[in-house]
Design a protein with these regions (language model features):
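Auxiliary Fe-S-binding modules of radical SAM enzymes
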Residues: 64, 69-152
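Core AdoMet radical
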Residues: 1-17, 21-66, 78-94
Length: 152
């Protein structure tokens, strides 16, 4: 009854690191691939798509620019997309429009979407906000844009 989430930005090394009995993956393991910008989406997602993994989640965090997931037809192979801004004193801005674009792609592809956190610097409706760490998750939740569809 235990399910593991393994998060990596090194999906290009994944096939070299799996156990010999991995096959097409384990039922109780989800491998999550992080992407922070379009450059890394274009590099990592084709590798991720072709990897022998039963359950896949894309984590766009820290979200550093708008990312177009449409070319990857995520509805065919992704369980969920997670989006979130960067935390910490050196955090870079996260634009709410970038988050909404990801959410819209998930909506059209019937993929679950979770807006996890705003990040420390959040831009919405022409205004910049500095958000304390303790409120970043709750502020994202208040946006009310999470999508449950596509969940198994």
């Amino acid at each position: 009854d235990l399910h593991f989430l393994i998060i990596t930005k090194r999906i290009d090394r994944f096939s070299q690191c799996v156990p010999s009995d991995w096959g097409d993956g384990y039922d109780n393991v989800t491998i999550c691939c992080t992407i922070e910008n379009q450059k890394y989406a274009d590099y990592r997602l084709p590798i991720y798509k072709d990897s022998a993994i039963k359950h896949k989640i894309i984590i766009c965090e820290p979200l550093l620019e708008g990312i177009d997931l449409n070319p990857f037809k995520i509805g065919e192979w992704i369980d969920q997309v997670v989006a979130g801004g960067e935390s910490g004193s050196q955090a870079r801005v996260c634009d709410y429009n970038w988050v909404l674009n990801l959410q819209n792609t998930c909506l059209s592809e019937n993929v679950s979407f979770w807006f996890k956190q705003t990040g420390a610097l959040f831009f919405k409706d022409g205004k910049s906000y500095s958000i304390k760490r303790q409120f970043q998750h709750s502020q994202a939740r208040k946006a009310g844009i999470n999508i449950e569809s596509g969940c198994e």
